[in-house]
Curated annotation (Swiss-Prot):
Pfam families according to UniProt: Hemagglutinin (PF00509)
Glycosylated residues, chain numbering: 46, 249, 335, 431, 503
UniProt source species: Influenza A virus (strain A/Equine/London/1416/1973 H7N7)
This protein's name: Hemagglutinin
Lipid bilayer topology: Single-pass type I membrane protein
Predominant location: virion
Remaining remarks: Major glycoprotein, comprises over 80% of the envelope proteins present in virus particle.
Signal peptide from the UniProt entry: 1-18
Disulfide pattern: 22-486, 60-286, 72-84, 105-147, 290-314, 493-497
Domain of life: Viruses
Subcellular location field: Virion membrane; Host apical cell membrane
Coiled coil: none
GO CC aspect terms: host cell plasma membrane; membrane; viral envelope; virion membrane
Purpose: Binds to sialic acid-containing receptors on the cell surface, bringing about the attachment of the virus particle to the cell. This attachment induces virion internalization of about two third of the virus particles through clathrin-dependent endocytosis and about one third through a clathrin- and caveolin-independent pathway. Plays a major role in the determination of host range restriction and virulence. Class I viral fusion protein.
Amino acid sequence: MNTQILILAISAFLCVRADKICLGHHAVSNGIKVDTLTEKGIEVVNATETVEQKNIPKICSKGKQTIDLGQCGLLGTTIGPPQCDQFLEFSANLIIERREGDDICYPGKFDNEETLRKILRKSGGIKKENMGFTYTGVRTNGETSACRRSRSSFYAEMKWLLSNTDNGVFPQMTKSYKNTKREPALIIWGIHHSGSTAEQTRLYGSGNKLITVWSSKYQQSFAPNPGPRPQINGQSGRIDFYWLMLDPNDTVTFSFNGAFIAPDRASFLRGKSLGIQSDAQLDNNCEGECYHIGGTIISNLPFQNINSRAIGKCPRYVKQKSLMLATGMKNVPENSTHKQLTHHMRKKRGLFGAIAGFIENGWEGLIDGWYGYRHQNAQGEGTAADYKSTQSAINQITGKLNRLIEKTNQQFELIDNEFNEIEKQIGNVINWTRDSIIEVWSYNAEFLVAVENQHTIDLTDSEMNKLYEKVRRQLRENAEEDGNGCFEIFHQCDNDCMASIRNNTYDHKKYRKEAIQNRIQIDAVKLSSGYKDIILWFSFGASCFLFLAIAMVLAFICIKNGNMRCTICI
């Protein structure tokens, strides 16, 4: 009887259990670790870096209309010191300021200079228009050794107005200019602070001096402040420059009686450009859209860790040096331990090892797809990729990097820290704000990447489960799940049959009769095995009862013959 059961079991396993199909996914020996919302250091098959760290130490200017100001400061192009003579009018979409550049020749400063610098950096160049001012009763040829060309001279775009004679009376004057253009006009004027009261009297006559400037949106009065100051460029006097943007059809009026540096031409901005302060060398052989003091950032990544003050079409600056974006599924590498386990399970259960939960059969040999099948049948073993599920996952993952870029990229403008004393508080606020923005975006970047990584892993898990469900619905009662990502098929399934399962063309009705018969045989094996266990337990109980009965009979005979005595004490 037992021999018949054993033969039936062997026959069932040889005929039925020999055919099996399993589902798995691509794996690599060394994956890449990424962070998700719920876990850090999850290993995935593929990932891409989102933080750019490579810098090009040159200003890439190919395809751009570039102007290198050299020794000329950007603000100097509006007033015309000697070093800026060739840049009084220009057109550019990339403006390079150098550290050696200077805005002035006679010592002084611009009021609100950083705002003006910001405007000019975006300007695309400057064109000029004569304001048409004429003067009588004064000299218009004031000059200084601080602004030398071939000899002493002055700012090319300004007029230094002086009394006709030393210590002579400077008449009260009023001059107006109307902007007839369609774009705003940049108007710049200066106030001269003499090195002493005596010098001011010599240049402009005696008495208090007052300059008043007004338009529809601006009104300000200025009084010069003569007095000794440290000499710069051989001068103890100072010229402070002021400016306004005059709207179309608006008029600016100047009223003055000395110490006035008059504008000669109005400036008009040409278009749009990028301006950068850098001493990096220009390179016409490379293209760039993002610049900083150290060169060019050329990258399609959403973030960068090179310079927090880069300008142009730049990746967002973040503090992290690396943020890996998952572009593949969770990796289950076939390491040595896994291979030993697989070898052990092959001995115990065939071709495929055990898994738990999500189908984590990682196959390093599956190189032409993300998801696939392994099978064994009478014709041997085989592996094949499933292109449809692979493409479905890839389609949903493709574009993740582009979506991150869309969320983060914007045109950045540079605000420098070259603030005068009055502007230092504003500068501190700007610096604090910039640092706060970096902190926020560093957190946002980490969060965005973690969200995308979580979605990618969940997505690839979902595609794996969809594939598993597709196979399960096809096989129905013709196969049994083993709980390890595999199906044991209850009929002979050759390579064509396996291919039909993979292609979703499997006809379960065709094999239903054979599968039911084989399933009944397997159930019979299980049932016979159950009866065998009952018989074993019954035999054990009967043996115990027989042993106890024999022992009692022997004891009774011994007591009867007097060979054994039983004494009961109370």
